[in-house]
UniProtKB/Swiss-Prot annotation:
Organism: Methanospirillum hungatei JF-1 (strain ATCC 27890 / DSM 864 / NBRC 100397 / JF-1)
UniProt-annotated binding residues for Zn(2+): C17, C20, C36, C39
Superkingdom to which the source organism belongs: Archaea
A Pfam family that the UniProt record links to this protein: Ribosomal_S27e
Keywords: Metal-binding, Ribonucleoprotein, Ribosomal protein, Zinc, Zinc-finger
Cofactor note: Binds 1 zinc ion per subunit.
Protein name according to UniProt: Small ribosomal subunit protein eS27
Cofactor(s) of this protein: Zn(2+)
UniProt entry tagged with the keyword rRNA processing: no
Start-end of C4-type zinc fingers: 17-39
Annotated GO biological process: translation
Family, as annotated: Belongs to the eukaryotic ribosomal protein eS27 family.
Subunit and partners: Part of the 30S ribosomal subunit.
GO molecular function: structural constituent of ribosome; zinc ion binding
Length: 62
């Protein structure tokens, strides 16, 4: 018997805001623009698949 499994390719990433150095966890395939909760600068822009992350990625969570 063949068992089909679907591997999850999306993940959460911890990023550092380039303007205020705030660390924030975001989804790497965000479908809405993600802004920093402290200063309001744009951290990620949706592209139809993976989001274009404009901040420094610190860690990725599986």
């Amino acid at each position: 018997m063949v068992q089909l499994t679907r591997e999850n390719r999306s993940k959460f990433v911890k990023v550092k805001c380039p303007d205020c150095e705030n660390e924030q966890t975001i989804f790497d395939r965000a479908c809405t623009p993600v802004d920093c909760i402290v200063c309001g600068s744009n951290l990620a822009t949706p592209t139809g698949g993976k989001a274009q992350i404009k901040a420094e990625i610190i860690t990725a969570f599986e």
